[in-house]
Amino acid sequence: FDSESAIDPDFLERSGCDLERLMYIQATSVEFVLETIEELLGATDEQLVFIWDSLALTPAISDIEGDFNPQSSMAVKARILAKGMSKLTIPIADQQATFLVLNQLKTNIPSGPMARQIAMVTPYTTPGGKAMHYAYSLRIWLTGRKSKSSFVTDEKGFRIGSEVRCKLEKSRFGTAGRHCNFKI
């Protein structure tokens, strides 16, 4: 599910993806993504991998149909995700499917004295509220390193990647809090 229209078939093929077994779906709304996953899980016994890029940029239907006032659709996406994940968690597990959700960090903008204190402790928030935090079996925080020494270059000196810091925020499979650096 792609909400950014940024998929490159040539890159996928060079990366080893079998395009004959890939189903590309434009993520038009959060509801559409969740309903499509439910349909696909019910349509086959094959083991499936769902990748959603990205939760942050996929709007809810009320966001599309509503006005530009952010207050008018506050917490709608979080409520949809909470309901969707409670509905899909068991079918995903029963089919041994994988559901990978990419999300972005947003700056936590305080709107009152108490909120300012909270924002000092947690300066970032993720779109979709806490629903996904509870549903995730594994939550990984990736941050790019900025120094030139972290750049990956080819034989001509062109930058082709960079080093990434990875921190395990939550894990039902092992110990949370572990971290490592690797190159992409």
Language model region names:
Residues 1-83:
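Conserved inter-motif catalytic segment of the P-loop NTP-binding fold
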